[in-house]
């Protein structure tokens, strides 16, 4: 196989297919090197979100001396270009990022989900997939750059759709959780007899209501305990002492009545 001629022919074919996207870095064999700007056609599906960025994958190809019997070397780079003047809005949104109790970013209602997707993290995985494809599809021995360029575009667009779907599901779950928390504010704790008595006991202890009631009763009885209070508090000699006091009171009354009768005579 004439490797030089094979590579020259493939480069000419690619120039005709990608007249605006292809840029030749070196066209001298055996160090042919070029890059292709692959514009992705992304779709938000049924989502109400809109695309505010244009995503392009820059694929750089280096052709070894024995290409295509040896695989080409591929380097990938992701580029993002704003479609509208949204840069100032995006900067303001960054200041309003919120996180949950576990440190995960919370998706807000006003947040545009497609803007959260970046291809930079996917490119290492994509590079491995392309290397595997060369072997799986048995591309060695034939011109493979066009097939790989097409695969890059297809895989990236598929990956984007999957990521957007995940974000939408995550947003729905978070929206449901927020709704539950909002609804919980309007539902108080169910009160049972046991919970009420427990609350009442703590409440009276905190405000010392029982002590206040006791002081109030003492004042009502001129500082003396009632018989019930003395019995409950275990005052010693309650019965005998009060019996003696009662007997003394009866004697005093009797003496008073006797004096009154003598005086009247």
UniProtKB/Swiss-Prot annotation:
Q: What is the lineage of its organism?
A: Eukaryota, Fungi, Dikarya, Ascomycota, Saccharomycotina
By its UniProt entry, which InterPro entries does this protein fall under?
GIR2-like (IPR040213), RWD_dom (IPR006575), UBQ-conjugating_enzyme/RWD (IPR016135)
Q: CDD domains, alphabetically? A: RWD_ScGIR2-like
A single GO BP term for this record reads: cytoplasmic translation
GO annotations of cellular component type: cytoplasm
What is the role of this chain? Acts as a negative regulator of the GCN2 kinase activity by disrupting the GCN1-GCN2 interaction in amino acid-starved cells.
Give the miscellaneous note.
Present with 10300 molecules/cell in log phase SD medium.
Give the protein name, as stated in the record: Protein GIR2
List each copy of the RWD domain by range. Answer: 9-159
Q: Note the subunit structure.
A: Interacts with GCN1; this interaction prevents the interaction of GCN1 with GCN2 protein kinase and GCN2 activation in amino acid-starved cells. Interacts with RBG1. Associates with ribosomes; the association occurs in a GCN1-dependent manner.
Q: Which keywords does this Swiss-Prot/TrEMBL entry list?
A: Repressor, Stress response
Q: Repressor as a keyword?
A: yes
Q: List the disulfide bonds.
A: none
GO terms assigned for molecular function: protein kinase inhibitor activity
- The source organism is Saccharomyces cerevisiae (strain ATCC 204508 / S288c) (Baker's yeast)
Q: Which PROSITE patterns match?
A: RWD (PS50908)
- What family is this protein classified in? Belongs to the RWDD1/GIR2 family.
């Amino acid at each position: 196989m004439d490797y030089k001629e094979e590579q020259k022919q493939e480069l000419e074919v690619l120039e005709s297919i990608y007249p605006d996207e292809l840029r030749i870095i070196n066209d001298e064999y055996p160090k042919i090197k070029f890059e292709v700007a692959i514009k992705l056609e992304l779709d938000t599906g049924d989502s109400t979100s809109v695309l505010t960025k244009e995503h392009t994958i820059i694929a750089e190809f280096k052709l070894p001396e024995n290409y295509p019997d040896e695989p080409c070397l591929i380097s990938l780079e992701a580029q993002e270009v704003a479609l509208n003047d949204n840069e100032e809005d995006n900067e303001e949104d960054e200041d309003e990022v919120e996180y949950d109790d576990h440190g995960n970013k919370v998706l807000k209602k006003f947040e545009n989900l497609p803007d959260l997707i970046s291809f930079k993290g996917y490119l290492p995985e994509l590079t491995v997939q392309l290397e595997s494809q060369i072997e799986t599809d048995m591309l060695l021995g034939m011109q493979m750059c066009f097939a790989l360029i097409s695969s890059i575009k297809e895989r990236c667009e598929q990956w984007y759709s999957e990521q957007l779907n995940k974000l939408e599901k995550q947003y729905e779950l978070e929206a449901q959780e927020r709704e539950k928390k909002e609804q919980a504010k309007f539902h108080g704790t169910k009160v049972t007899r046991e919970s009420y008595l427990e609350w009442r006991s703590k409440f009276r202890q905190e405000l010392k209501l029982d002590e206040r009631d006791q002081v109030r009763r003492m004042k009502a009885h001129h500082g003396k305990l009632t018989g019930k209070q003395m019995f409950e508090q275990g005052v010693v000699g309650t019965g005998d002492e009060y019996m003696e006091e009662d007997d003394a009171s009866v004697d005093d009354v009797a003496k008073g009545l006797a004096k009154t009768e003598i005086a009247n005579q």
